[in-house]
Structure formats: C-alpha cells, structure tokens
Regions:
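Phosphate-binding loop of NTP-binding sites
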Residues: 4, 27-30, 50, 64, ...
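Short, flexible loop segments at boundaries between secondary-structure elements
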Residues: 385, 459-468
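Short acidic/histidine-rich motifs immediately flanking catalytic phosphotransfer sites
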Residues: 65-70, 158, 434-437
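Adenine nucleotide phosphate-binding catalytic loops in nucleotide-utilizing enzymes
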Residues: 9, 14, 49, 186, ...
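Short acidic low-complexity segments
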Residues: 55-67, 150, 421-424, 429
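Active-site beta-alpha connecting loops in nucleotide-dependent enzymes
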Residues: 7-19, 24, 34-40, 313, ...
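N-terminal leader/targeting and accessory segments in enzymes
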Residues: 1-100, 222, 244, 249-250, ...
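Glycine-centered, small-residue-biased loops immediately flanking beta-strands
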Residues: 213, 381, 437
Length: 468
C-alpha cells in the first residue's frame, strides 16, 4: 500500500448513500480507513455503512468535514454544497469519485467495464466468474449484486473490477489492465457534443490500458466496431458475428435465463447457462465476462460455473415475485435502447401481456431522445406514464410525461395513459392486471417503490379488480 495514501486516514464522502459512493466507502472501510459521510436522507445503504463502522450524517453541514484529510464528491454534488465550501476554506483536497476509484484501482490489476448499456450487469458477471475461479476479486459496481448482497467487496486477490462511468468523463482517470466496452450510444448528451465525441472518449479509455493489457469489444455494436481502427492495444472481440474472436451461437432464451454456445478462436468451449437476467443483450454481457476470464486464462469449466451461479443484479430485470398470477418486475432502464431490450426480454418469458409503468428520468434526456422514446414501447400491451423524475434538473417547457404520452399515441400506440401521481398509475395497473400478466416498473428514478407497493396491493382483494 502506498505510504502517501495511508496518510489520508480520514476520508469524508459527500452523498455517501449514492450507489457509486457507497461501494467505494465499503472498500475503504474494509481497508481500515476512518470513513464519514453525509446524505440528504438516511437509507438501508447508509445503515449498512454505519454497521461497518462509518459515521453518517443526515443532511449536509460544514461541521461534518472537520478532521477529514480528503473530501470525495460525486458528480451530483455541486460547488455550493456547504461541505465542499468548508473543505475549500480549510484547504482539504476535494476529489471526484472517479479519481478516488482510480487511486484504489492502482493497488491491484484493474478490470474496467464501460458502455452506455449493460455495464452493471457485465461487471457483476465478471465478478461472479472470477469468484468461481477462486481469484477472490475486489469489485465496485453501480448496482447490488444479488449473490453478494452488496455493491462492493474487498477481495484478497489481485484483480479489481469496476464499472467505469462515462457519464461525466471520469472513467478517463482509470488505468485498467483490461478495458471492456459493451455498447456506445447517444447518452449523456449534456456532457458530450455528439456521438463522435463519445466515441473519441471511449478510444482514449481503451488506449489507456498498458501494452500487455487488452481491449474487449462487442463486435455486434456498430458504434463499438467503429472505434476498432483507432485502438492501439491488443483486442478481443465478442458477439454473434462469426468475425468475433469469441462467438456466441445457438442462443436459446427460456424463462428468465438463456443457454448458448461459445467458441473462442475456433475452439468450441461448449454450452453455457445464464439463469438471470433474460434477453439476448444479457447473453452478450455474459460473453463479455467470459472474454475477460479467457484473457486471464480462467478455464472454461470455471467460467461455466461462474455464469451458472449468477443471480442477477438489483433493478436489472429484478423479478420481485408473483402475486395472484401477476409477475412484478423492476428495471432501471432509462434509455430507449435499454427499454426495448427489457421489453424484448420480457416477451421471451411467455407472459400473457406486458403492463408497463414508466417514469422518465431527467428532462434533458427526455428532450434529447424524444423521438426514440416515442417508438420504444411497441411491445408494451398497456403503457402508463407518470411524471418525469427531475434528478436535480429544472423543468424544460413542453417536456412533460403528458406530452410524451401524446407523442407515443401519435406514433401508433393504442394503449397509453398518463397519470400525474404514482398512486393513480398504480391503481390503473391494478385494475388492468390479470393472471398471467407481468407488470414492469421501468426507470432510473424512484419508480421501484411502485413495484414494492404493487406486490402488496396485488395480494389484497379490491372490488375494482377484474372478475376472472
């Protein structure tokens, strides 16, 4: 461990309850650091950190930073935050989350998974496979890994797996040995000027690996294939294309999982089973993880075991349960491509109908991808929209869920509804649902609360419910 890092024994995290921050806090606590943090509201996540030895303050106040050697902030924290201002006054270093993640990664061999879609699931599968291979990896992931029950873990092995977030360009601070790119898409257009700008960033990210490292790239994605000529490092491609180094074939999508064959550089590795989550996009995510493991010389048998043990990630096609014949699924999808992939995956699960409650996330994203959103819900038999989750943004004139519902209707959807309140949305879905249907709550805001409520209410008798 570097002496200089050890001098910074007390570290304070502003927004410690956030999904990316809590994972870093957990690793630091397990490394023996004194950790404090603050968040607007306490939550099960902050309670977990308190139990691990963190001191967590509710609300932000200047006094919270006293005695800290460094302050870590997520991209959601602005310069006007009283804790940031106090740290500046006291000349305490204020560092972005991505920078601290990069420092932690230097301590081991880094494996960084980037991409517009699929990175949380892929990172989690990599962790599952390396754990099955007895490599005891450390990981920091932007979602709860179901079999580990946590977003982060400090392992004794030499590999550090992180989800690399391109949303604010901080993934360029990372220095991984293996860089994975699952997808590149028009996303985070408040930070990037164009798709080419995003691709340039991914090229920089991939070329940051050392000469003995590897870039693992999805050949099925045109926007990823587009960066290959600019990559100056060893490349392993994966996909259903026979031009890939790791070829997926014979994929069968059944229930909540899949079965498929993998062939690596001409060698048949046999059949693999991924029990969760469903969809061809998750077969690709599993192949990305297999490519990482193959590069690290993990035997195919252990890769097979790691995939077979994978229990999914929180809020990624998260099956909450079945009540009175109705299946409730919660999903984090907030980009049109993700929503379409989730609905296509749900179609393979053989439900009678798909009833969708969608909460758009951010006014800017809704505005930038308006036309795409209006065409993303064709596979939803019934679509209910509730108000946009602002995520600290100010409203934009004309950008409302009500107007989006109108645009979806104009694009040809015959069964789309808008309700201002989450409660009315839930009521409508309860009246609509019949045995054999699935209700999907989709969005990156607080829509998963609705999935919990639906689970409760589906189990209670209501006079408004359809007679079966």
């Amino acid at each position: 461990m570097m002496v200089s890092f050890r001098n910074f024994q007390r570290i304070h995290l502003v927004g410690i309850g956030g999904i990316g921050m809590s994972g870093i806090a957990e690793v630091l606590l397990n490394l023996g650091y004194q950790i404090s943090g603050s968040d607007l509201k306490l939550s099960p996540t902050t309670e977990r950190l308190t139990a691990l030895g963190a001191r967590v303050y509710e609300g932000h106040a200047a006094a919270n930073v006293t005695g800290s050697k460094a302050i870590v902030v997520s991209s959601a924290v602005d310069a006007a935050n009283p804790e940031v201002q106090e740290a500046r006054r006291l000349l305490i270093p204020v560092i972005p989350r991505g920078e601290l993640l990069a420092e932690l990664m230097r301590l081991k061999y880094g494996i960084a998974v980037a991409g517009a879609h699929g990175k949380t699931t892929t990172t989690s599968i990599v962790a599952s496979v390396l754990a099955a291979a007895h490599l005891d990896p450390t990981f920091v992931i932007g979602g709860r890994v179901n079999q580990a029950g946590t977003t982060a873990r400090l392992g004794k092995g030499e590999f550090f797996i992180v989800e690399a977030d391109e949303s604010d360009r901080t993934f360029l601070l990372l220095a991984p040995v293996v860089a994975v790119v699952t997808t590149i898409d028009r996303e985070h257009l408040d930070q990037y000027s164009s798709l080419e700008d995003i691709q340039d960033c991914f090229i920089q990210f991939v070329n940051s690996v050392p000469f003995y490292g590897a870039a693992i790239l999805c050949l099925d994605e045109p926007n990823v294939q587009g960066i290959i000529p600019e990559v100056k490092r060893p490349i392993i491609t994966y996909g259903v294309s026979n031009q890939a180094d790791l070829v997926i074939s014979g994929a069968k999508l059944e229930g909540f999982g899949s079965e498929f064959r993998l062939t690596y550089k001409g060698e048949d590795l046999g059949l693999f089973h991924l029990p969760h989550p469903p969809g061809i996009h998750n077969v690709r995510n599993a192949a990305a993880a297999a490519a990482v493991a193959l590069y690290l010389n993990v035997p195919a048998e252990l890769i097979r075991e790691g995939l077979a043990k994978f229990a999914g990630v929180g809020r990624r096609f998260d099956v909450k349960g079945v009540v009175n014949g109705v299946t409730v699924v919660d999903d984090y999808g907030h980009h049109p491509v993700e929503i379409q992939a989730t609905l296509e995956a749900a179609r393979t699960c053989k439900f009678n109908r798909l009833l969708v409650l969608f909460q758009p996330h951010r006014y800017t994203r809704t505005q930038h991808l308006w036309d795409d959103f209006s065409r993303s819900f064709n596979l939803a038999d019934v679509l209910v929209l509730t108000d946009i989750y602002p995520a600290s943004e100010s409203p934009i004139a004309g950008v409302t869920s009500e107007a989006l519902a109108g645009a979806i209707r104009e694009a040809g959807h015959k069964n789309v509804f808008y309700f201002r309140s989450m409660q009315e949305s839930i009521e409508h879905l309860l009246q609509e649902a019949r045995p054999g249907d699935a209700i999907l709550t989709i969005g990156a805001g607080n829509v998963s609360r609705a999935s919990n409520e639906l689970m409760l209410l589906l189990g209670t008798e209501r006079p408004t419910h359809h007679a079966h």
